[in-house]
Amino acid sequence: MTETQLTPEVQAFVKRGQEMQSAAASTRKKMRQKKFDTIAVHGIYNMEAALANQGSILEPAYLSPAQHFENSDHMEAALAYLMPSWAYSRIANPTIGYLEETLALLEAYGFSGETSACVTGSGMSAIFMATNPFLSGSGPMNIVASAKCYGGTFMLFMERFGNERGVEIRWVTNPMDLKEWETKMDKDTRFVFGEMPSNPGLAMMDIKEVAKLAHQNECPLIIDSTVATPALMRPLCLGADIVVHSLSKSIASSGMAIAGVLIARHNLYSKIGPDELRENFALYVKLLPFRDHGPALSPFSALMILNDLRSLRSRMDLLSNNSMIIAKYLEAQPQIEEVRYPGLESFNGYDIASRTMWLVDGDKDSGNQLNRYGHMLGFTVRGGVKQARKVFDNFQMIWRATDLGRIKSVATIPAISTHQQQGNVGRDLAQVPGNLIRLCVGGEHPDDVIADIDQALQT
């Protein structure tokens, strides 16, 4: 139904919706002038919004699955997507909307363009929603992706897209090799995907240069920046089109929620899809594919993440400093073969990390830009798989779990956990040996974490 076919009563609601959109745009514009920490604390929830919510100074949890409408005209305008509404929580929800707006602003910090976000029920659902729309239609198509990626991403691409749907998967074995990226892309490439830094190997890639190559082939560059978070790196500023996060990890460090998000620049690169897909990808996904697939997040989980998000920058600063201390300790231990941490000069990729990973607004704190490299590291244990498992089993304070990004230190052996299902070939591509331990450093004092590692190595 076109707007000219609408009744005057429905058109009145459409006009009201335009006024609502204008007010929201004005709020976003004001918040984009604020510093990162201020955006993380407030998002777009201001005093006017609080007064409309019984004066609550925190974003309310809208737990009702459905919205009440004033009348049938209001319902018609809302369900035709002609005015802002949430209608049904599988499509949208006010609490989730506050989280989406905050994340879009944080990821766009320092970026001149416009962005939008779509929050999902998990990190993997965010990756699926960020990639699947580019695989529509028929004819030959391929994906170019870094092989240094999370096991779930590998399985989604290889099994679901590749083996089940016939999409050609072209793995880039060395993401720092621009020539390999270039030779893998062609006119049939639908999207380019990388993790920066990667999980668990912390592999690096030059986002700016890979973005140029992707755009030359009229396809978007999608970056999973879960490990860095917007506090340390914002790929949109480097030329990426879409950023995905598993919000369950470093952003929601309390570990009380599973969630994901895709954040996209407006007017992204893509040779396929309708104009709406390119113009505002996150909104397109939210109103159509997301609506139909249904990977919605609980509003209560959104509220938990909003509360964790408020301290993101200071938390990533602390945890990065702790991780550097622990990485240097590990590097000096004879029982350790290799330490993978982007902040070590011995790390393959240190130069890229040092150019790319900065504590946001660090110069405003100290007068100088501050490199911070995150709180995930990996180390291989001398003596092989058996010895690595012995060290792992001897941890007394560090938690053994497949999780990461917690405020508590957590370790896993990726070869038998996060990267088990992809098999030996996939693990070899990702460079995940059986004696690799992934450690995500928490907020404990680093001396105590080191003491636990030390006793595990000595036992």
Model-derived regions: residue spans:
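A glycine-/small-polar-enriched, mobile loop at the entrance of the PLP active site in fold-type I
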Residues: 52, 58-105
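Conserved PLP-enzyme active-site core in the AAT-like
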Residues: 2-52, 106, 112-334, 339-340
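Short, acidic Gly/Pro/Ser/Thr-rich loop/turn segments
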Residues: 68-72, 269-270, 312, 384-387, ...
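Pocket-edge structural micro-motifs
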Residues: 63-67, 90, 121, 413-415, ...
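Conserved C-terminal alpha-helix-loop-beta "cap" of PLP-dependent enzymes
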Residues: 28, 42-51, 335-437, 441, ...
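Short acidic-aromatic active-site loops that bind/stabilize oxyanions
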Residues: 88-97, 116-120, 197-200, 442
